[in-house]
Amino acid sequence: MSEHRHRSGDLHQQNKGFKGGKHDSKGAIKRRAQGKIETNGARQSIKNLAIVNNKDAMRQKHQKLVKSKKNELLERKRLGLPDQVAPRVVTIIKLSESCNTKKVKEMLLQKFKLNINTGEMEMDNEETLNNKNNNNDNFTTISLTSKVRMMLLECQTMAYDQVIEFCKLSDIILFVIDANQAKLNSEAERIFTIVKAQSVPTVIEIIQNLDQTPIKKRNELKKSIQSVFHFHFPNEPKVLPMDTNDECSQVLRYIENIHVNEIIWRKVRPYMLIEKSSYIPETKVVTIDGFIRGNNLSAKQIIHIPDYGDFQIEKIELIDDPHIRKKSYYTNNNNNNSNNNNTGGGEMEQDKKINILDKVDQKDKDTLQTWNVPDPMDNEQALPTAEEMKEIEANKKKKLVPKGTSGYQSSWYLDNESDEEEENFENEDLDMNQEEMGQDKEEEMGEEEEMGEEEEEEEEGQEELEEVKESNKWKGIKHKSQITDELLKDSDDEDDDENKEEQSEDEDEDERKQLQQDEILYPDEVDTPGNVPSRIRFSKFRGLKSFRSSPWDVKENLPIDYAKIFQFHSFNQSMRASIAILDNAPAKPDMYVRIHLVNGPKQLVERNTTAITTKPEVAVGLYRYENKISLLHFSVEKHKSYEETVRSKEEVYFHFGWRKFSTSPIYSISSPNCDKQKFEKFLLPARNTMATIYGPITYPPAPLLIFNGKDCNELVATGYLSSVNPDRIICKRIILTGVIAKSISKKFVTVKDMFYYPEDINWFKKVELYTKMGRVGHIKEPLGTHGRMKCQFDGTMNQQDTVCMNLYKRVYPKWIKDDSSLLKLE
């Protein structure tokens, strides 16, 4: 009997609703807010946002802001930093060819009465700061307030390599879009991808020609542009038109008050936007001027300039800030050691004060050597000295050998007698010696007859072997001695991979796509060669009981390239120690300094003095060991816009942190719970892949952009530095497959087409088998002489099942090209 339950009728009791009292509930406050909540920094409570601040609260908030600014100023003085921070680097980038970046720059400069062509003031204006001593006319510095300055740059093209160089050092990016072409094209999408892959700086969207749109459609057009922009940059809400002077003033106010995002990988290293450079021919020293940004700089460090290489620092000088608003604002407490710096590129002004911040001896500087020169005799046994050879001759034992035996043949005979037995043998009677000599002669005659018979048998065997070779030649079968040279060429090693890559270049893209599709459908499956024994063809491969847990010695059979690279005993400990060295470095951020580079790049000076540069030049201070070569691993993902195939060991172009170079990575799948990673032939889309190269050591974090060539026309993949570890094992897997020829019983079957020689079956007999339907088994014995074998499995077999065998070998990336700038010896 079911349990009776009461069901209320129409006249059921109605209780009173809950009354929260004078305060509102969280849900009521949230509904009233309607999502119009703007938070700065940490997340705030909804109840706190719902309270309207009165005058006392607003006054208290203002006092806290003033106090925080005073504390910040005191902290800067305590650390020895200048009163004014370095100018904010603002870059103008267009998103379509119809956009006019020159007009945007002209409007911003005309607001301060600056001429865009000359960069000079049309009227006297203290608020405008223009560096007239710069070699590069692309730099224009403007003082927005007494504390905030702006350095305005213009990216004149949409070339990806130019956009990357500007984005790497920009604090604020002004993206310019044309209202007549509101939809983003593929190039604009890739520019957004490039910016996001390098960590997003502060971004403002500028809309041009919005005044040409009908008034009724302006709001709708602006909302559509804003929705697209917020999709790529959800934390950047600033989308502003800029067609009038009032709108230009609004943009400047946002630039002045907007919070600048900190980019971690850029902040941890000292870097400088080179504003001026000169060459001293007497000492072959190149000087570069600019603001130190990011971290502290020491003269012990190595300076890296993209496209030019690494250089040592002779000294670092503190000079007057040429962008200062008023000379009275700047006071140099360290006014000693001021002198004139006569350079080949021009003389310094007499009123500028120079103070040497840091200068170290040559022995204390980091070396420029990037790789080790391996010694091929390192693993060889040391040759014995003359004294050791004399001891060997003195202790050399005498052997009893048949008469007529040569010194080479005497080494075949074992010497099991002791020294005492030899002495006793030498002290025996002459008669005994004669008897033994007679016996020795008889033995010699018998041995000569036996050796003669053996020689005849060998000759007969050679004749038979020649006959077999002759018959096999007509059958298409090669003898083992004949295929030795071919195996050296066809073996699955690095040389073979390179040959395959050269052949793949001749293949058209359709064939490469077909190979990639086959790799997706049938991963790692290979055909067993019929004319070469598998035990020789796959001699470098091995079987593993478990890919995850089976041991593999990381120091086993390493290539000669591993003798050239550097390895850390503890990478994290070395990284922390290298970063801690810069804590007490004398050159602080926001200081305007002059760096003297030993044997600096003269081409840099010539380029800056002959023409207006299309991209800015930057100098980066490297940590200790960051110019050494090691094995680097990157986490990458193929970009959806790149449809062509990318093979392992195919040359691509890396934009890696501040560096850029050509390299040939190998790809693998990362397994977090395994000490071995599986090699991938292709960089497949929609899959997180690891790329491994020989490259300069870099402490993470560091972003990565991969292009198909040095011209950077097409973006291949994006990623970041994962680790620096030469002990990471990357295994190439091949799968040998066979089909079931006959079922002997439920668990015993005959397998064919996996091998073609019974010797190969015995060679790989201990390797575990499995099927595509989940059965596991092993080889029992070969059947016949044509490669069939009897196998046993753990369950009933299906006749349509496929038998597989996994074999593995360790692979390594290609070494850096000899003409690369990454290889350098002192």
UniProtKB/Swiss-Prot annotation:
The Gene Ontology biological process annotation of the record reads: endonucleolytic cleavage of tricistronic rRNA transcript (SSU-rRNA, 5.8S rRNA, LSU-rRNA); maturation of SSU-rRNA from tricistronic rRNA transcript (SSU-rRNA, 5.8S rRNA, LSU-rRNA)
Q: Quick check: keyword Nucleus in the entry?
A: yes
Q: Which GO terms describe its molecular function?
A: GTP binding; GTPase activity; U3 snoRNA binding
Q: Which residues form the Bms1-type G domain?
A: 86-261
Keywords of the record: Nucleus, Ribosome biogenesis
Q: Which GO terms describe its cellular component?
A: nucleolus
Residues covered by region (Disordered): 1-37, 329-348, 397-532
Q: Where is the composition biased (Acidic residues)?
A: 416-434, 441-467, 491-510
* Pfam name, any one: AARP2CN
Annotated compartments: Nucleus, Nucleolus
Instruction: Give the matching InterPro entries.
Output: AARP2CN, Bms1/Tsr1, BMS1_TSR1_C, G_Bms1/Tsr1_dom
Biased composition range(s): Low complexity: 332-342
Q: What does this protein do?
A: Required during maturation of the 40S ribosomal subunit in the nucleolus.
Q: What family is this protein classified in?
A: Belongs to the TRAFAC class translation factor GTPase superfamily. Bms1-like GTPase family. TSR1 subfamily.
Q: Which PANTHER family match?
A: PRE-RRNA-PROCESSING PROTEIN TSR1 HOMOLOG (PTHR12858:SF1), RIBOSOME BIOGENESIS PROTEIN (PTHR12858)
Protein known as: Pre-rRNA-processing protein TSR1 homolog
The gene name reads: tsr1
